[in-house]
Structures are given as C-alpha cells and as structure tokens.
Amino acid sequence: MNVKEFSTVSSTNDTVPRILVVGGGYAGFYTAWKLEKHLRRGEAEVTIVDPLPYMTYQPFLPEVAAGSIEARHAVVALRRHLKRTNVLTAKVTGIDHANKVATITPPVGEPFQQEYDQIVVTAGSVSRTFPIPGIADNAIGLKTIEEAVAIRDRLMSNFDKAALLPPGPERDRLLTVVVVGGGFAGIEVFAELRSLASALL
C-alpha cells in the first residue's frame, strides 16, 4: 500500500507517544481503560478503533439469547467509560508497521491513515462455520449482541408457529435446536435455551 494514497491523521502533540488499540472488545477495552488508569493526563495519546461503539461482554451472550437478561446489560459503551481515549467507530483495514501507519475506514467517508508509535492488535474473532453442509447458510453465530438477539427472536418465532400446529414433523422441526460446538459458549447456550424451552412449553 502506498502511504501517500490517503490523508494522514497525526497526533496533535508530537511529543507524546501515540498508542493505537485495534479492536474494542474485552481485551481492547481493558487495554485502553488500564492505560487511562496508569498514565497521567498528557503522557500518551490513546486511540481505540472498532466498528461498534461498545464492548460486548461475551460470557453474557447465552443469557441474552435465552432472554434471561436484556441485551443492554451485556454491553459497555466505549465513549462513556473511556474519557481520555480517542474512540473511532470504524475499521482498521490495513497496517503498515514498517512506517507505523494504520489505514482506517469509517462507515461514511474516505479511508484515512492514523500514525502510531505503539500498536495493540485485539481485533477479536468471528464464528467458525466448519466444513459442515448447511452451517454457513442456516446457523447463527454467538459472538455479538446482534447474533444473540437473532437467536432469541428465531426461537420465539418458532415457538409461536409451533403452538398453532398439531404434533407432527413440521412442529418437531420448529421445536428442534442444534448447538454446534461443545465449548463454554455451546454448553452455556444449550443450558439457557433448555431452560427457556421448559418455561415456554
């Protein structure tokens, strides 16, 4: 990438180190939060970049999917809690570490470049679909609030439809949930959804 292709945003104070945090999830949020706690005002310029303006507390997502807690209780607004951090709601689409410049792509407008002295990459993860036919097209992941709410909405819709049907294959299909993965999230969401189903049936 040619560093001259985009405009460059440099620090307003070139005498302080510029710390760029890529990703506003758990690791990124707490990195910026701890830097605010340990650095004096003006000692460094911290910028955090994430497509979302909030951190998602992922251990609560199974509870959100089952409706045990509201979605707003599983998120932390970045700007509300990071008072001395520059919060950019955008994506980091390129890193030129040799020149210490990151390409930032906002949801509206042209990409620009952000200079840094230190970079912390905590971009997070996405749900894996595995080489299983039908997973990519039909399954819903469980990494974001939006996915947890989508699971809850799908379940409630299926229960409403099943309530109008007599016993049979279509009713069984609507009331069947498959959890792919037996890790922490898989076991938690299985237990939460079973409790939800028991309460509704």
List the predicted regions and their residue ranges:
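Beta1-alpha1 glycine-rich phosphate/pyrophosphate-binding loop at the start
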Residues: N2-T89, T93, V177-V178, F184-L201
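FAD-binding core/adjacent interface of flavoenzyme oxidoreductases
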Residues: N2-V16, N86-V178, L196
